[in-house]
Regions:
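Membrane-embedded alpha-helical bundles that constitute the cytochrome b-like, heme-associated redox core
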Residues: 1-192
Length: 192
């Protein structure tokens, strides 16, 4: 083989390697995306329409339901949605931060804490909203006081979540909001 032919072959092999390494990978399946955008829309709606009327209550239960479906899905899913990918770890978070927050294809260890906090608050809002309407708690202020406090905490978490998504999009030079729409991310330097 001549030098130039060898160079051509080498370049072609390199091209194949590069295109395989950066080919898009499926990360968020349809159920994860549907549950995410349902949760986002219902939370945003209830934070604005906060008078506790029938519509507020129905929309709130739909959001909590979307979250429960997502968590049940984690029990059977085999992709990045599975429960094994949702286990937060202090040690993993420390190592991740020490390494300069390297790119993750699934949830990164730091963002995972916020995901669980948001889910816990949505569950708490569903429960406190429900018990505030029970006859047993008629005249009691504390269920709705806790509900209001959790709603404020959720608003703060959502703002941090959005800052996190934008910050990591910039840090990794990757459009994370688009990945939650299409379900795809680029392959390559993925950790998991
Ligand atoms: C994502 C879920 C939810 C969010 C973000 C949310 C948010 C809020 C907010 C911000 C308020 C106003 C609190 C205040 O007085 O300062 C409120 C009130 C209330 N919410 Fe929710 N909520 C959610 C789910 C629910 C659910 C599932 C119920 C079911 C019963 C519910 C029932 C109520 C009631 C009864 C009030 C009291 C209204 C009043 O008397 O002033 N909420 N909610
Ligand atoms: C009230 C609004 C929102 C709530 C409550 C919320 C909540 C969540 C939750 C619970 C997850 C975990 C998803 C899962 O594993 O099932 C998540 C992930 C994500 N959310 Fe949101 N979200 C909201 C708004 C948004 C918006 C407006 C965007 C886009 C600008 C966004 C972008 C993302 C992305 C990109 C991820 C995946 C993060 C990653 O790559 O690890 N979210 N969000």
């Amino acid at each position: 083989m001549t030098d130039s032919a060898a160079r051509r072959d080498g370049a072609a092999a390199g091209a194949v390697e590069v295109s395989c390494a950066t080919a898009p990978v499926r990360v968020w399946d349809a159920l994860v995306r549907l549950a995410h955008w349902t949760l986002a829309a219902t939370v945003a709606f209830d934070l604005v329409r906060d008078d506790g009327d029938r519509l507020h209550r129905i929309v709130g239960y739909v959001g909590a339901g979307a979250m429960v479906v997502r968590l049940l899905w984690a029990l059977v899913a085999r992709n990045h949605a599975r429960l094994a990918e949702l286990k937060p770890s202090l040690q993993g978070t420390r190592a991740y931060l020490r390494a300069g927050a390297p790119r993750h294809v699934g949830h990164d260890p730091l963002g995972l804490w916020m995901v669980w906090l948001i889910w816990a608050l949505v569950l708490g809002l569903g429960v406190t909203g429900w018990i505030s309407r029970l006859d047993a708690f008629w005249g009691e202020d504390w269920p709705i006081d806790i509900h209001a406090w959790m709603a404020d905490a959720l608003l703060a978490c959502v703002l941090v979540h959005l800052l996190g998504v934008l910050g990591m999009s910039w840090h990794w030079r990757e459009n994370l909001p688009a990945s939650m729409l299409t379900g795809r991310k680029r392959g390559g330097d993925a950790r998991r």
